C-alpha cells in the first residue's frame, strides 16, 4: 500500500481520542491526521464527555485506566448520548480489558482494543480494522 493511498483512507473520517497521557494523544493524533483522519483529543474523561458531539465521530478511542472516570464508565456515558458510535479501547493490558469485558460488558467484541504501546502503522491498521468491522 503506498502512502498516497494510505492518506486517502482516512478522508472524511472523524476520530476522538481520549487518554490521560497528553504525549500519547499528540502522537496518535499526528499519525492519524497524516493518514487523512480528522482527530479531536481530550486528556480528561469528564471534559471529553461534556464536549462530545453525538452523530459526529466515526470512532472513539478510549484509554481504560484514567482518573475521574475510567474508559468503561465513559463508554456507558457516550453510548447514552450516541448509541451508534463505534468505540474501541486503548490499553497496555489486554488481560485487564478481557477480564472486565467478560465480567460486565459481554456484548463488547473481544477485539475492540488497541494495545499500547503502538507504532503508527499498527495504529492505522487497527483503526481501519475496527472501523470496517460490523
Segments (PLM) and residue ranges:
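Acidic, metal-coordinating helix/loop segments flanking the phosphotransfer/catalytic sites
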Residues: 41-59
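Receiver (REC) domain active-site loop signature in two-component systems and cognate sites
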Residues: 66
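Acidic catalytic/metal-coordinating carboxylates
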Residues: 43-44, 70-74
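Active-site residues of response regulator receiver
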Residues: 19, 63
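Two-component/phosphorelay signaling modules centered on CheY-like receiver
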Residues: 22-40, 108
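Alpha4 helix (beta4-alpha4-beta5 surface) of REC/receiver domains from two-component response regulators
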Residues: 73, 94-115, 121, 125
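Non-catalytic signal-transmission and effector/linker regions of two-component phosphorelay proteins
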Residues: 1-14, 119-134
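Hydrophobic/aromatic residues positioned on beta-strands within the core alpha/beta folds
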Residues: 90-92
Amino acid at each position: 500500500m503506498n502512502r498516497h493511498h494510505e492518506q486517502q483512507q482516512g478522508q472524511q473520517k472523524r476520530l476522538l481520542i481520549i487518554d490521560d497521557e497528553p504525549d500519547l494523544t499528540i502522537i496518535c493524533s499526528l499519525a492519524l491526521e497524516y493518514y487523512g483522519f480528522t482527530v479531536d483529543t481530550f486528556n480528561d474523561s469528564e471534559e471529553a464527555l461534556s464536549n462530545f458531539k453525538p452523530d459526529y465521530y466515526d470512532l472513539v478511542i478510549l484509554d481504560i485506566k484514567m482518573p475521574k472516570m475510567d474508559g468503561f464508565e465513559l463508554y456507558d456515558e457516550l453510548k447514552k448520548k450516541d448509541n451508534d458510535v463505534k468505540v474501541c479501547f486503548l490499553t497496555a493490558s489486554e488481560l485487564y480489558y478481557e477480564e472486565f469485558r467478560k465480567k460486565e460488558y459481554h456484548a463488547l467484541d473481544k477485539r475492540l482494543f488497541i494495545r499500547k504501546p503502538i507504532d503508527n502503522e499498527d495504529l492505522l491498521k487497527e483503526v481501519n480494522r475496527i472501523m470496517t468491522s460490523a
